[in-house]
A protein has these predicted regions:
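Structural signature of PLP-dependent enzymes
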Residues: 302-327
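Conserved PLP-binding catalytic core of the aspartate aminotransferase-like
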Residues: 320-324, 330-364, 415-425
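PLP-dependent aspartate aminotransferase-fold enzymes
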Residues: 98-195, 199, 212
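Active-site-adjacent loop/helix segments that line or gate small-molecule/cofactor pockets in enzymes
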Residues: 2-42
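PLP-dependent enzyme catalytic core of the Aspartate aminotransferase-like
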Residues: 307-309, 368-425
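Active-site core of PLP-dependent enzymes with the aminotransferase class I/II
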Residues: 198-224
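Glycine-rich loop-to-alpha-helix module at the N-terminal edge of alpha/beta enzyme cores
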Residues: 55-133
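Active-site PLP attachment segment
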Residues: 249-280, 291-298
């Protein structure tokens, strides 16, 4: 099937000359099928357009930040109004106070907020705040869990030395015995325990937090004086209008936020409860653009939509429609899918596909039919997605299943993925 990508190919060639690897970080397409565009030219609602003019129904939502739909009218109006007044100033804007008030009013465990730019900023702020509270060193982190790209947590080890992680102790997510063992290993020096909102790692099925595990984490932190830190950067406000762990009835001491809170404008946050306010005050954290006003205005408008609109119910509804439709399609072509996690944050794998050749081929065939899915990362549904969008998506994925069935006898293992997975073991 013809799929124009001349402009994207030219951009890749130019990028390779001036950007290491042609692109870096989580938005590099190096591990995706070759037809995937590296660059995009514009977006609106649920749609993306690449430089060659190809249009996609986007199920990655900028890897999470697009919650309400690209270019949401209310959010864009708030951002534009603030831009006319000023963005990055000599001091923070007055709306920073309004934003903090709004945020803590929505999150039940929170009494204060600090703002930054990216999820890594927020999780790293949480770590130093936890250490400052009782002057302890050890941080407990679930193994093979993504909390950002700082030296203490980046999944790639190039440029990282052992000292960067000397005070990190690992445990298995949702495993009470493993968590208790990690506490014992740390003795009386546990500063904090990081836990993802739910398990949402690449190349893995997703798991929601088990109530027994979540309550044990809370109990162990209470008994030891350690801080319980929920990383809600990816899942925040996509599962609940509160911290995601509110779904299991557990309140953390700190929570890290990002992605959706300004519907794509660059801002993240650390939220905390009253007892840890003084520790947060004592740490020195800052950045040249952390106090920019335009993202804060966008965040206020976004949080207002989160509080008052039916965005969450809309995402859940269309997510379930898509999930049910894909199950039916897969079965019709003799395939079985594992669809895990919340329907509005779907992770999809094929059964009996250990080297990912089926998933990669299916995603490639969907892409050239105008649907942007991801072969190994969890996906995201935004509130702008309609039932008609789902219908069009299923039309494309149905054709993709048919194409996969024809191509399956000649498919080869995805070598670049298998090499990466071998390194992760």
């Amino acid at each position: 099937m013809a799929w124009p990508n001349k402009r994207n190919s030219e951009l890749r060639e130019r990028a390779n000359k001036v950007i290491p690897g042609g692109m870096y970080g989580h938005q590099s397409t190096a591990l995706l099928p070759d037809v995937y565009p590296q660059f995009f030219s514009r977006a609106h609602g649920t749609r993306l357009w690449d430089p060659d003019g190809n249009e996609y129904i986007d199920y990655m939502c900028a890897y999470g930040p697009n919650l309400l739909g690209y270019g949401h009218e209310t959010v864009e109006a708030a951002a534009a109004a603030q831009q006319r007044l000023g963005d990055t100033l000599t001091g923070p804007p007055e709306i920073m106070v309004t934003l903090a008030e709004k945020f803590v009013s929505l999150v039940s465990h929170a009494d204060w907020a600090m703002f930054c730019k990216n999820g890594t900023d927020a999780t790293s702020m949480a770590m130093v705040t936890a250490r400052a509270y009782l002057d302890r060193k050890k941080i407990l982190v679930a193994s093979k869990t993504y909390h950002g790209s700082a030296p203490w947590c980046t999944p790639r080890t190039a440029g990282i030395v052992a000292e960067d992680r000397a005070q990190i102790i690992y445990y298995e997510y949702n495993n009470p015995e493993s968590l208790e063992s990690a506490f014992r290993s740390a003795g009386d020096d546990v500063a904090g325990v990081f836990a993802s909102a739910f398990r949402h790692e690449v190349f893995e099925d997703q798991w929601m937090p088990d109530p027994e595990f979540a309550n044990l984490a809370r109990k162990l932190c209470d008994n030891s004086g350690a801080l319980l830190i929920v990383d809600d950067v990816r899942a925040g406000f996509r599962v609940a209008r509160d911290c995601t762990w509110s779904k299991v009835g557990v309140k953390p001491d700190l929570s890290a936020w990002g992605k959706v809170i300004a519907n794509g404008y660059p801002i993240s946050a650390l939220l905390g409860s009253e007892r840890f306010r003084e520790a947060a005050r004592r740490v020195f954290v800052t950045g040249s653009f952390w106090f920019s006003a335009v993202p804060m205005a966008a965040a206020i408008a976004t949080l207002d939509q989160i509080e008052k609109s039916g965005y969450l119910e809309q995402m859940e509804k269309t997510g379930r429609l898509l999930r049910d439709g894909l199950h039916q399609q897969a079965a019709a072509y003799g395939y079985s899918l594992r669809q895990t996690g919340p329907a509005q944050m779907p992770q999809i794998f094929f059964e009996d596909d250990p080297d990912y050749r089926l998933k990669y081929c299916w995603c490639e065939e969907a892409l050239v039919r105008g649907v942007y899915l991801h072969p190994y990362h969890n996906m995201f549904i935004c509130a702008a997605l309609t039932e008609e969008d789902v219908r069009l998506t299923l039309e494309a994925t149905g054709e993709a299943f048919a194409a996969l069935k024809k191509r399956q006898p000649t498919l080869e293992p995805v070598e670049k993925v298998n090499m990466l997975l071998a390194q992760r073991k």
